[in-house]
Amino acid sequence: MNRTAYCFDLDGTLTTVEILPCIAAELGISEEIATLTRITMEGLLTFEESLRLRVAILGQVPLQTVHGIINDIQVDPRLSAFIQSRPDQCFVVTGNLDIWVNQLIERIGCGGHTSLATAKNGVISLRHILDKGEAVKSIRNRGFDRVIAIGDGSNDVPMFRAADTAIAFGGTHSPMPAAIAESNFVVHDGDALCKLLNTL
């Protein structure tokens, strides 16, 4: 039997909003972080450079506050239902920090691959920035014959290249040109995405 793994980007793919601008609103700089997020998704700034900068800025927000903000973030109900119907085959693959998003991934109800960080005395230190391509290889090595990747930004390109099938998803906003260029399918609606996933 063919075993398929489904790898989902988190921000703006599974969630109905981008997470980091929501955290930035606590500091009154949501527009600035949204701009930084956008130029990163467009590939104008490397994900590593952008993440280090965003962590340095947003690390000022207490973890408890971050968890409260993320707890209020909605997940696309159609994608959530798809994942919950096959949790052992689904994975969140996000460059976001484990200490910020682990509770959200638990709520989604599947495995997750994240960037790693520690928090000590109110200071966040990055330990490891996730390589999405390596995450897909790691997931494949768990005994999956096929990997389908779903994302929306240029930072999803390594995941798309390592997968067998790549889907650029525009659920929250249009997928970036780099993601579209590496994709096999482009979908703009959660219902359409679930139908496609069920037929692949």
Regions found by a protein language model. Give the residues of each.
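C-terminal cap/substrate-recognition subdomain and adjoining C-terminal extension
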Residues: 77-200
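Alpha-helical substrate-recognition element adjacent to the catalytic core
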Residues: 2-120
